[in-house]
Amino acid sequence: MISNILKKSNSLFLRSTLSSNKFTNVTILRNSLFLNNNNNDNNTNIKQTYNKINFFSTTVPNQNEKIELKQEQIKQEQQQQPEQQPEQQTNKINNEIELKIKILENSLKYVNSYGWTSEAVSKACIEMGYPPITQGILGEDSAYELALYFVTKCNTDLMIKLSDAENSEQQLLSGLSKKEKVKLALKLRLSMIKPFIGRWSEAMQLLANPKNIVNSSPSMLTLVDNIWYLVGDKSSDFDWYAKRGLLIALYTSAELFMLSDTSVDHSNTWRFVDDRVDDLIKTIKFKNDIEETVGITLNTFLQKIKK
């Protein structure tokens, strides 16, 4: 009788031990069942079984406690790890930027052989002692990044040349009219692409690609804005936008003309720039004359009405 009861209890408590969310302790029940049956062999076997259940139930944690223990372990590991100082983070970023610039600058040597392509960047990485996969640091399209780097570098170099008071170009610039200053600035900027003129159409395609145009536009806007600034233009409102839009169109057309120019030292391109700048200044002057004429006429008309 007691044996049957204990067998059923054994099964029930085993299931309880495995499914419970807390530790299960069956010691109390075990003691109460065996108080008056110490001489029974069957009871002894059952007692051993309960001892096993008691050991199992008091040594195996449930799933929730495992998760809590793991979270506590992760928290302790995070506390032990030293936090990166802002200075260390800044140095890491600066080192990464320097590496990008070195790779891109070195890649320019391979443009004439491999074009504005990822292959040119790979060759540069290999020469520097890095595997070709290192170009991934530049982004998804290393060829585009190379073209964008070059035009940005050229814009910066132009600004430095025309802003340096000790530079010979600055001395020439100071003695020129606004029209001649614009011509000189455009010619200096166009001359910077001469070393890559045979491959420049590839760069233009990359920069004008619809997926890249958003990132490419600021470089062109910076170029024309710098030129008008160096010329001394102080226009505002609509004039500011009109002049920059016209100069962008002029420079782009000059680049396209230069691609097919076979004249000595691109003399035809420089003549093209001279003619287009003359037209640009005439257009701006004509626009200003029209505005002035309309203003005078309107003012005269209003004065007559008041009388």
UniProtKB/Swiss-Prot annotation:
Q: What does this protein do?
A: Membrane-associated protein that warps the membrane surface to access and bind aromatic isoprenes with high specificity, including ubiquinone (CoQ) isoprene intermediates and presents them directly to coq7, therefore facilitating the coq7-mediated hydroxylase step. Participates in the biosynthesis of coenzyme Q, also named ubiquinone, an essential lipid-soluble electron transporter for aerobic cellular respiration.
Q: What is the lineage of its organism?
A: Eukaryota, Amoebozoa, Evosea, Eumycetozoa, Dictyostelia
Q: Name one GO biological process term.
A: ubiquinone biosynthetic process
Supply the InterPro entries for this chain. Answer: COQ9_C (IPR013718), Ubiq_biosynth_COQ9 (IPR012762)
Q: Which NCBIfam families does this chain map to?
A: diverge_rpsU
Q: Which Pfam families match?
A: COQ9 (PF08511)
The molecule here is called Probable ubiquinone biosynthesis protein coq9, mitochondrial
Binding sites annotated in the UniProt record for a 1,2-diacylglycero-3-phosphoethanolamine:
Y241, A242, K243, R244
Q: In which pathway does it act?
A: Cofactor biosynthesis; ubiquinone biosynthesis
Q: Which UniProt keywords apply?
A: Lipid-binding, Mitochondrion, Transit peptide, Ubiquinone biosynthesis
**Family (UniProt):** Belongs to the COQ9 family.
* Low complexity biased stretches: 76-92
Q: Where is this region: Disordered?
A: 72-92
Q: What is the annotated localization of this protein? A: Mitochondrion
**What are the recorded GO MF terms, alphabetically?**
lipid binding
Q: What is its main location?
A: mitochondrion
**GO-annotated cellular components:** mitochondrial inner membrane; mitochondrion
